[in-house]
Amino acid sequence: MIAASLPEAQRARVHYVAVRDYYDDGLWADSVRRKVADAVPASRVALVACFKDATSYYLHHFPQWTMLNQEIDAGAPIGATAIRKVLFEAEDVDVSLGALAQLLPKAIAQYLKAWTMLPWYAPLVQEHRAIEAYKTRWRTAPYAPIFCTVDALVQTGGHVLLVKRGGYPGKDLWALPGGFLEPRERLLQGTIRELAEETQLGVLAPTLEEALVGVAVFDHPDRSQRGRTITHAHHFNLQTSQLPEVSAADDAALAQWLPLASLPAMEEQFFEDHFHILNHFLKLTHEQR
């Protein structure tokens, strides 16, 4: 879309490099620096920056580059939030696209029109509406809520137990079994309860407690679009050759043992940062701190 909005003479001057998410600022910044160095070796680098709001903090991760700070024009809002709102919330897509045509370069408006005809658009509309409905329920709270969740990573026989989410947000995406902690629960107790509710795993709670090999907190402020959500992931290694029986229940559409070897190629199929939780415990990729 960026290339389509540029004059033809400028397109050859612009290079695009993909950088994956890490939910780890240090790893991400290191990756950006490597990718830039590979794309333009032995070059002076300037970072064209705009400190829009608190989410712009990452610009400070590159002190070795010359920063060219751009002032915000109050009359020209920066960001795609308003565009997403029009695209995902209007009752009539054609009307929405007509409104966006006044805000965007012609090539971008045409691209979005074609994109809304693809099979991914309708599920994203449902995803957006589910997230907005979730946030709306908490807007009357006297302060921004912070949610506490638990997740279970159960490993055995070269496999890991995962669920497919049955509803939005994250419908049909793979995830670790888990959910919100109840008021009178300890973290481990809540993890085992959620595991049983979603997978019907045929393993007794005392056996799971003995199989616990690791616990980690995942607290990146942007790890969930629903709001600030801090999860406590518990890693269980049953160390059995047989895979215990499982059956999806509660809000899981599917519960299944998946081979560890298949996980690295599935990163884009996971809900929120659940692939990164798996990577933390299982070292699925070579990019680790």
Task: State where each predicted segment sits.
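Short connector loops at helix/strand junctions that flank enzyme active sites
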Residues: 11, 42, 147, 155, ...
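Structural signal for conserved beta-strand scaffold positions within catalytic alpha/beta enzyme cores
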Residues: 18, 49, 68-71, 162, ...
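N-terminal strand-loop-strand
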Residues: 131-176, 203
